């Protein structure tokens, strides 16, 4: 491992209605040691209470990916989109030349929990666009977001992919970061290899490694795996 980010060392923003943990520097949280990895700029782990959310705000030249873990997001944007994104679905918004949007907890009975990731695009000034989908798990590693939209994945303006990793108790996998940069963000459960144990919210970055073996604990393991351009 070239980069280890324990969950309890992440930055935090708490406004009462929002409890957000920042893997990398974001907003008022700044740490020069945690500015992102490769083209992955943001991983925010957000919890939003009932009836609350983010009012209309703007972005430009950023690929914004949202994966809902609990509850549902009500999304509305300046492109005319108004959708509900329930748990298990993933959303991609390319901000391009500029877009405004709002995100609120749609549920009246349960809190909202989601991950939001920002990836720097390889082309600036594109037309803003939006996609969302649900992709069923097909084996331990299932692709969610890619540069070419293969296998029903959302299409990203960058040479990068995001996979959902799900391992049953005791199941093992080898993650491949040869000639690339890999980043693993743990969602739930536990896993380990010979040198490190990880649990929910922990992150591991591989910038000079070829492969990484991982075995799930007794409670299984779920994570997102980012396949990113190599760090020069």
For each of these PLM feature ranges, what is it?
Residues 1-232:
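Jelly-roll (double-stranded beta-helix
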